[in-house]
Amino acid sequence: MSKNEEPSPKYIKTENLLEKIFASRAQTRVVQHFLDRPKEFFNLSRIAKETELAHSTIHRVMQPLVDMGLIKEIRVGQQIRLFILETEQDVSKILAKFYDDIKPHLKEL
């Protein structure tokens, strides 16, 4: 693409989506945590403990992931919230496939 060409709207959407998914190191760590355990349910405290991030950080990064359709939130009663990788959305399927493909190479880095 030359300097004068405008990026296509599809490119912009994809670029923005990747920026949203990997918005911070904390959010990236949480995404990876769910990708490593795609069939497990987690509450906020367990996510914080297993990712070694502050509970307040987990609370802040979870909502954007839910809004994007990467993580599914399930409310149990009035106070308990459980989270699991959303496996039915295209964005999460593509991300999971990508992660599975690169995972063996991450150990080399």
Regions found by a protein language model. Give the residues of each.
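Short alpha-helical segments that sit at the start of domains
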Residues: 2-29
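Short helix-capping/hinge SLiMs at alpha-helix to coil transitions
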Residues: 35-39
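A short acidic, leucine-rich amphipathic alpha-helix
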Residues: 46-49
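Short, hydrophobic-biased segments on the C-terminal half of alpha helices
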Residues: 62-63
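Glycine-centered, phosphate/nucleic-acid-interacting loop/turn motifs that mediate DNA/RNA or nucleotide
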Residues: 69
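Short, Lys/Arg-rich nucleic-acid/phosphate-binding segment
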Residues: 75-82, 88
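Amphipathic alpha-helical dimerization/coiled-coil segments
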Residues: 90-109
